[in-house]
Curated annotation (Swiss-Prot):
Part of the 30S ribosomal subunit. Forms a bridge to the 50S subunit in the 70S ribosome, contacting the 23S rRNA. This is Small ribosomal subunit protein uS15. Belongs to the universal ribosomal protein uS15 family. Pfam families: Ribosomal_S15. One of its GO terms (cellular component) is cytosolic small ribosomal subunit. GO terms for biological process: translation. It comes from Rhodococcus opacus (strain B4). One of the primary rRNA binding proteins, it binds directly to 16S rRNA where it helps nucleate assembly of the platform of the 30S subunit by binding and bridging several RNA helices of the 16S rRNA. The keyword rRNA-binding applies.
């Protein structure tokens, strides 16, 4: 369920601003997206896991707020990020 250290490093190297970046909005959104994808796959198999479903909704809300912040601060970074992550087709 949780991301392994290797998965985190891979996501952060791809979306972070530098190697040890964990706090930039892009890095945070990428980490949340990875967790959301994993949790969605879990819920496809375990349809009655309502506790995890609530956690998924909280993660989606947190990602939505971060994306709204990035959109407000720098629209070019926002557009680049959603294109790279494959969000909002």
């Amino acid at each position: 369920m949780a991301l392994t250290t290797e998965e985190k490093k891979q996501v952060l190297s791809e979306y972070g601003l530098h190697e040890t970046d964990t706090g930039s909005p892009e890095a945070q959104v990428a980490m949340l997206t990875k967790r959301i994808v994993d949790l969605t796959e879990h819920l496809k198999m375990h349809k009655h896991d309502h506790h995890s479903r609530r956690g998924l909704l909280l993660l989606v809300g947190r990602r939505r707020r971060l994306l709204k912040y990035v959109q407000k601060v720098d629209i070019a970074r926002y557009r680049s990020l959603i294109e790279r992550l494959g969000l909002r087709r």
